[in-house]
Amino acid sequence: LKMPEMLDAAIEGSIKAMWICGYDIAQSDPDVDHVVAALSNLEFLVVQEIFENETSSFAHVILPAASFLEKSGTFTNAERRMQVVQAAASPPGAAKTDLEIYGLISARLGHELPYEGPEDVMAEIADLTPHFAGVTFERLGRRGLQWPVAADGTDSPVLYETAFELPEGRAHFAALPYKPPGDEASEDYPLILVTGRRLEHYNVGTMTRRTGNLELFSSDWLEIHPEDAQELGIASGDVVEVRSKKGRIEIEAQVTERIEPGH
């Protein structure tokens, strides 16, 4: 199931429990009311996190997890480069790495996981995934390897030099059919909401709201074009209520020509 389908199933009652790891869905999902309805209807919710957050407020059990600085493993970036991450500190208090948590829960359920550490997980991935066949912690070293990695450890800094892995050797381009927006302006909702990003925060701020960045940008505001503001009697600094089919919010307005009329 996709996430919206999981939430629908929780509301309907066919999904009765969830285990959410490292994802503050009650903060980051665009339809928060939908999420709240789903989480509130669960019979059992486990949240595995490094901090308490909006999602953990619905949890029956919170499993304290280690941050990325407190656990070893690997990550792969958009350059196809796999790199080793080494823990710089031990997890505080009762916090444990994700692998330790999964191992302990699995053991209590009667199945011992065959991993003593992230090296064993990487070995299994290499055994099951041809593109990672030659990957080991030792070979990754300080600079990592770019997959595909042959069994002898040779990696692929350039993925395609002369042709693509297709019968004719050429890339495929496909035209996608037009899909109208999910919501359009109407008599009841005449304006279109455009959500954006702020330099000071990463995405919806589930991480950066816990840093000094909050002093640089502590709250959101609504930008509205002067034409729309005049029609609605709104001035910069006014606190306005914004309503949609999904929910409502009270927020400070800023009148600016940065935004187009009707948005």
PLM features per residue range, with description:
Residues 1-134, 196-263:
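Non-catalytic alpha/beta scaffold blocks inside enzyme catalytic domains
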